């Protein structure tokens, strides 16, 4: 497959090499990055028209070239910061004209010179010397005219020319750092779990399958972090967390990407009430440190993380919307509601708990704007959660919703190996009936539980959705550095 290189730029590379000039040198000595130059100049507070910092060496990518006879201006940028270069023929001699022959937009150059302010007050570098560091073979596109899909497929250019994309990534990794720091401060340790696993589990989802040639066995990319993190708890680690990629072979839409980043943590001797309190403290702390406020704007909503967050059971929240006590409704009444809203429960199983879950997703979820804990789910919704201590038929589970999105899921974890074995077998029966998302039977995990797992609270938070909220982005693709895009789009010419 031929690359769509600019023939003129390729010829420049060939000509430079014929003249003994390497257009892709190994190294360049930079004394100051552009962002550092700006900080130092600002701290001095003196907008001198005479040079005030000498022998500066910096580098950047060429954004604009404005030639004016014997004196010209060039803009370069690096890490989102721009610097104006002032180039004069009396300083550069024969290299002055060569610059405009060999250097173009998108090229990376190194420059040396003295810093000053122009008569218009713009910080500039009087260039004494320059060096081409990387000749771009493709002309930078007009990014404003490109489709979102093309931007996602060519993120390296998106990051260069789209300040919003770059800023979203900076905020993303600040959020992840602050999550880690918060959990370290609470005594959690960061651990790792296998990405490729012989049995997938910890969620209800379709996996990606691969083949291990040496073992001649089919294995799976993990769909969650849960079951191996619980093995740490069984092994005597009382507070553990992992931030890692998980993979679910399912839909791609504005809130779903098959590869996404998940935080999961497990806390021995805690329950879902403790996890609720921890989740509230975690999100409040992270949002405040990243934004310097506990309030953010997401679309038309102002979302407040100050707390306390609302807490309401799934049954009560659905009853409020319907204007009728859900617990008093018959199964036939629930089926009629399912038909009314054209809903099908998981695995096409019209059992009471799964119908209530589906009706909740349809009717209640879109109404949840500020952080809200929805608690006490039907037992049919998960095989990994401990039954409710006071409410038969329910489990001690909560999910947290913000701006109509689920962002967290938590349990008082099931630690009874006999019940776990039974629930796994029931999931297998659902799989045989056609539920492709049913949880597989994990014999080794049941064996691990049989050695004894202490009472434990567990939490999962979708990192990408938290970043969506903080950066005010409605598409998950905007906050994932390299979202999943069709290879046809990736290989499409500029």
From Swiss-Prot:
Positions with a binding annotation for Mg(2+) 1: 399, 406
Catalysed reactions, as listed in the record: tRNA(Lys) + L-lysine + ATP = L-lysyl-tRNA(Lys) + AMP + diphosphate
EC numbers: 6.1.1.6
GO molecular function: ATP binding; lysine-tRNA ligase activity; magnesium ion binding; tRNA binding
GO biological process entries: lysyl-tRNA aminoacylation
EC category: ligase
A Pfam family recorded for this sequence: tRNA_anti-codon
Keywords tagged on the record: Aminoacyl-tRNA synthetase, ATP-binding, Cytoplasm, Ligase, Magnesium, Metal-binding, Nucleotide-binding, Protein biosynthesis
Binding site for Mg(2+) 2: 406
Superkingdom of origin organism: Archaea
Gene Ontology cellular-component terms listed: cytoplasm
Family to which the UniProt record says this protein belongs: Belongs to the class-II aminoacyl-tRNA synthetase family.
Cofactors (names): Mg(2+)
Protein name per Swiss-Prot or TrEMBL: Lysine--tRNA ligase
Primary location: cytoplasm
Cofactor binding note: Binds 3 Mg(2+) ions per subunit.
Compartments reported by the entry: Cytoplasm
UniProt-listed InterPro entries: Aa-tRNA-synt_II, aa-tRNA-synth_II, aa-tRNA-synth_II/BPL/LPL, Lys-tRNA-ligase_II, Lys-tRNA-ligase_II_N, Lys-tRNA-synth_II_C, NA-bd_OB-fold, NA-bd_OB_tRNA
